């Protein structure tokens, strides 16, 4: 949703995590979200389905076969991408990948194959992910989300707001904290709008690059708005944490769908994943930081005062297990089923959506 609208943007989302028993790190993750976007009606309705399968081929050498299938229909044109790739860790810092695939757009099709190596495997992880990882490795430093958007200049108030925002960045950021509190910058908005078939003119902002100081906005002291892809990488990094190769002792999968039309955006995700929980010591296990699957990382921009979030989370523990510590605190419990909604949880969700990296800590044991 683009700022400047008089209508309220509402994001509804429901998440469910079902954990396996014992010392297993596996779990099922389900997410559903629906966002009405009255200010950004797509001209081209989009329907996209994604499936990713990961299968271990040689556990000792860390060889994994990834199979990806993506199908989308944009303005009645069907597009497909199929890729199968075998990935192996040659050394601690070196990975090799060999694969093949095919791409089709309408009547056009193309097959391809590839072989590549990655040396010094640096990749970005958000602060939220970092808290679950003892020694994170970053790609391109400490990035935060992009500001990439198209803005319709509908009225003088919006023009003044936009010019003020640009000045606050180009002027060295003296007033940047005030602007960042007023608007929600969530994910690579330009990419989401552009790929969703939404063409909004007459102004296009391709990138902004600003770094925060010691006292950053909304409690975030280390942040950076950077060109091209940090929001996407953040989202991917959260999901890849759920795919630790050393735990991939059976096939894992993610299946998702994305729909956009004049009524808004719908996202659904179902996964069977090997990295949903981690050993926290002392007989405790930690559930990985709440993925917030579609809400935080898939390109929404909404005016702060007109953006509401309605999020629920359900976690189902193995039989005989109990939550020993939870922050934010759960709302209700029925045997091994725990639910979060409203209250401290809602405040935490809003904090994350405004760029915060507030604590989400759930520890459970028998």
Swiss-Prot record:
Residues the entry annotates as binding bacteriochlorophyll a 4: 290
Single GO molecular function: metal ion binding
Binding site for bacteriochlorophyll a 3: 298
Record keywords: Bacteriochlorophyll, Chlorophyll, Chromophore, Electron transport, Magnesium, Metal-binding, Photosynthesis, Reaction center, Transport
Disulfide pattern: none
Matches recorded under InterPro entries: BChl_A, Chl_A_sf
GO terms of biological process kind: photosynthesis
Binding site for bacteriochlorophyll a 7: 297
Binding-site residues for bacteriochlorophyll a 1, renumbered to this chain: 110
A Pfam family hit: BChl_A
Binding site for bacteriochlorophyll a 6: 145
Gene3D superfamilies per UniProt: Bacteriochlorophyll A
Task of the protein: Intermediary in the transfer of excitation energy from the chlorophyll to the reaction centers.
Subunit structure: Homotrimer. Each subunit contains 7 molecules of bacteriochlorophyll a.
Protein name: Bacteriochlorophyll a protein
Source species of the chain: Prosthecochloris aestuarii
